[in-house]
């Protein structure tokens, strides 16, 4: 822990991993009431480009080592209609993400609505406990300079 407090400043949007970084600071400030904060959740998007490649005359050939029986299994299972393996992986990432936010904002979170992936306007994020203050950057700097006695 630093003897000097760290400040995470959200300039219009602090979402997902960007919010996760800001949440590690001692104080989290958003620049205005319409700044968006949150999007705490995980997902994976997969694209099947097989048909597009075939239309271009490209044939994909994959050769795996005999021992690599699980290599890319969750991906191919999901592409073939069974996302359960990929879902387990995404859920594990999500659990770790939520645990980080809980630890970073310990004692400041007022409810669990932040865990759903929702984006909040700053005034709502303040009520939930995702941020500590709402003020413009120039005001934050002015206050810091005043505290540090810098003109």
Please name every model-derived segment.
Residues 1-4, 13-104, 147:
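Small-residue-centered hinge/linker elements
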Residues 8, 62, 134-135:
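A generic structural-conservation signal
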Residues 9-15, 114-118:
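Glycine-rich beta-to-alpha transition loops that act as phosphate-gripper elements at the mouths
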Residues 22, 125-126:
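Hydrophobic residues within well-ordered alpha-helices
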Residues 26-32, 129-140:
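Short, well-structured beta-strand/strand-turn elements
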Residues 65-71, 115-118, 138-143:
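Short linear loop/turn motifs
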Residues 87-112, 122-123, 132-151:
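C-terminal long alpha-helix characteristic of the crotonase
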């Amino acid at each position: 822990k630093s003897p000097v407090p760290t400040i995470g400043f959200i300039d219009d949007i602090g979402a997902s991993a960007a919010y996760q970084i800001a949440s590690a600071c001692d104080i989290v400030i958003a620049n205005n009431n319409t700044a968006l904060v949150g999007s705490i959740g995980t997902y994976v998007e997969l694209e099947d480009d097989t048909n597009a490649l075939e239309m271009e005359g490209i044939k994909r050939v994959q050769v795996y080592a005999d021992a690599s029986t699980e290599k890319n299994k969750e991906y191919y299972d999901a592409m073939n209609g069974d996302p359960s393996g990929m879902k387990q992986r995404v859920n594990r990432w999500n659990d770790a993400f939520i645990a980080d936010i809980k630890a970073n904002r310990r004692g400041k979170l007022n409810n669990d609505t932040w865990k759903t992936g929702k984006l909040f306007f700053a005034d709502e994020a303040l009520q939930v406990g995702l941020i500590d203050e709402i003020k413009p950057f120039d005001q934050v700097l002015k206050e810091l300079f005043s505290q540090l006695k810098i003109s």
